[in-house]
Amino acid sequence: MADGYEDLREDELPGPAYEGYESAELACPAERSGHVAVSDGRHMFVWGGYKSNQVRGLYDFYLPREELWIYNMETGRWKKINTEGDVPPSMSGSCAVCVDRVLYLFGGHHSRGNTNKFYMLDSRSTDRVLHWERIDCQGVPPSSKDKLGVWVYKNKLIFFGGYGYLPEDKVLGTFEFDETSFWNSSHPRGWNDHVHILDTETFIWSQPITTGKPPSPRAAHACATVGNKGFVFGGRYRDARMNDLHYLNLDTWEWNELIPQGICPVGRSWHSLTPVSSDHLFLFGGFTTDKQPLSDAWTYCISKNEWIKFNHPHTEKPRLWHTACASDEGEVIVFGGCANNLLVHHRAAHSNEILIFSVQPKSLVRLSLEAVICFKEMLANSWNCLPKHLLHSVNQRFGSNNTSGS
């Protein structure tokens, strides 16, 4: 699915260390865009998305739905786990979060269109295989959609915006049809500014009555939670890819638009926005109104209300419809996405590369381990003097691949 207009494809091919599960130690996941990735701080969980078909003239295809890839943020190594149970259909543009090592997945686009189903997967399970569970929630759910955003606050998942079908039930907020969707679909779609809450204890859907001026309807925007504020930046509405910044107070449900001082990032969709401290958000990549892929990075300082350009070594690696997760080590881990114009789908350059952005100083332990590995020939004879947990970390780091660091 594109971020508002184009259907790019319409068919589909048929413990903490995660050591005990039925898995395969492969090099890395396939290249992809439109996937989801969530983190528990030490591991990044990757599911879904799609890639280009290698046979010219055939559609892009969704990646296998039973595959869950786990990236160890400390060692830089991947592990594939095959899941069972109520496995979601292969999709792109879904929305996912990880809370207490439980993965929640909502919405997306599959071979038959948009969905509003809700799934969960408990990665803490001691079973030999991880199991998906489809949750039959109560209340009025959001409409079927993809490319929406989510905030996590207390025991609530708060979903905002997206692109999909007209709601079947009466909901609070605005829905704007995409006129072009009438041409190529029997189920026309559009953008919305709807806010929906799911209580993860009762699994009941509800809608808050918000105050203030809400953002315009949009899709392919990016959301981030800091404290009791749910931030949203950019996204696409009709022909515009925007650079406005808003937050929703998740206690009072009041919308506020922020007008930062100084320079600001250009308007974009399909970007990522990641909280990296109690006062900073990290923005990377995206796709402009004139269809240019972006490789710029910015930090937004909440207390100063200003954007600051972030210098990094990945300026030759634009990404859009990628994912980004923060680690416990002060890094942002970007995975996958497309490196060129995604809408020219037979030429789309999907990626399976990891890009690492160091947004905070590394810990002394991390610096020491990196020094040990850097000078491994000189220090190898002394490794057995290390505490067992540090020796394990050093040994695991060998064999790492597909990681480009900053």
Curated annotation (Swiss-Prot):
<dbReference type="GO" id="GO:0043161">
    <property type="term" value="P:proteasome-mediated ubiquitin-dependent protein catabolic process"/>
</dbReference>
<feature type="repeat" description="Kelch 1">
    <location>
        <begin position="31"/>
        <end position="85"/>
    </location>
</feature>
<protein>
    <recommendedName>
        <fullName>Kelch domain-containing protein 2</fullName>
    </recommendedName>
</protein>
<keyword id="KW-0539">Nucleus</keyword>
<feature type="repeat" description="Kelch 4">
    <location>
        <begin position="221"/>
        <end position="259"/>
    </location>
</feature>
<dbReference type="GO" id="GO:0031965">
    <property type="term" value="C:nuclear membrane"/>
</dbReference>
<keyword id="KW-0880">Kelch repeat</keyword>
<keyword id="KW-0833">Ubl conjugation pathway</keyword>
<comment type="subunit">
    <text>Component of a CRL2(KLHDC2) E3 ubiquitin-protein ligase complex, also named ECS(KLHDC2) complex, composed of CUL2, Elongin BC (ELOB and ELOC), RBX1 and substrate-specific adapter KLHDC2. May form oligomers as a KLHDC2-ELOB-ELOC complex; this interaction is autoinhibitory for the E3 ligase complex as the substrate-binding site of KLHDC2 is blocked in the oligomer. Interacts with CREB3; interaction is direct and specific as it does not interact with CREB1, ATF4, ATF6, JUN, FOS, CEBPA or herpes simplex virus transactivator VP16.</text>
</comment>
<dbReference type="GO" id="GO:1990756">
    <property type="term" value="F:ubiquitin-like ligase-substrate adaptor activity"/>
</dbReference>
<dbReference type="GO" id="GO:0005634">
    <property type="term" value="C:nucleus"/>
</dbReference>
<dbReference type="GO" id="GO:0016604">
    <property type="term" value="C:nuclear body"/>
</dbReference>
<dbReference type="Pfam" id="PF24681">
    <property type="entry name" value="Kelch_KLHDC2_KLHL20_DRC7"/>
</dbReference>
<dbReference type="InterPro" id="IPR015915">
    <property type="entry name" value="Kelch-typ_b-propeller"/>
</dbReference>
<dbReference type="GO" id="GO:0031462">
    <property type="term" value="C:Cul2-RING ubiquitin ligase complex"/>
</dbReference>
<comment type="function">
    <text>Substrate-recognition component of a Cul2-RING (CRL2) E3 ubiquitin-protein ligase complex of the DesCEND (destruction via C-end degrons) pathway, which recognizes a C-degron located at the extreme C terminus of target proteins, leading to their ubiquitination and degradation. The C-degron recognized by the DesCEND pathway is usually a motif of less than ten residues and can be present in full-length proteins, truncated proteins or proteolytically cleaved forms.</text>
</comment>
<feature type="repeat" description="Kelch 3">
    <location>
        <begin position="148"/>
        <end position="207"/>
    </location>
</feature>
<feature type="repeat" description="Kelch 2">
    <location>
        <begin position="92"/>
        <end position="136"/>
    </location>
</feature>
<feature type="repeat" description="Kelch 6">
    <location>
        <begin position="322"/>
        <end position="359"/>
    </location>
</feature>
<dbReference type="GO" id="GO:0016567">
    <property type="term" value="P:protein ubiquitination"/>
</dbReference>
<comment type="pathway">
    <text>Protein modification; protein ubiquitination.</text>
</comment>
<feature type="repeat" description="Kelch 5">
    <location>
        <begin position="271"/>
        <end position="311"/>
    </location>
</feature>
<keyword id="KW-0832">Ubl conjugation</keyword>
<dbReference type="GO" id="GO:0140627">
    <property type="term" value="P:ubiquitin-dependent protein catabolic process via the C-end degron rule pathway"/>
</dbReference>
<keyword id="KW-0677">Repeat</keyword>
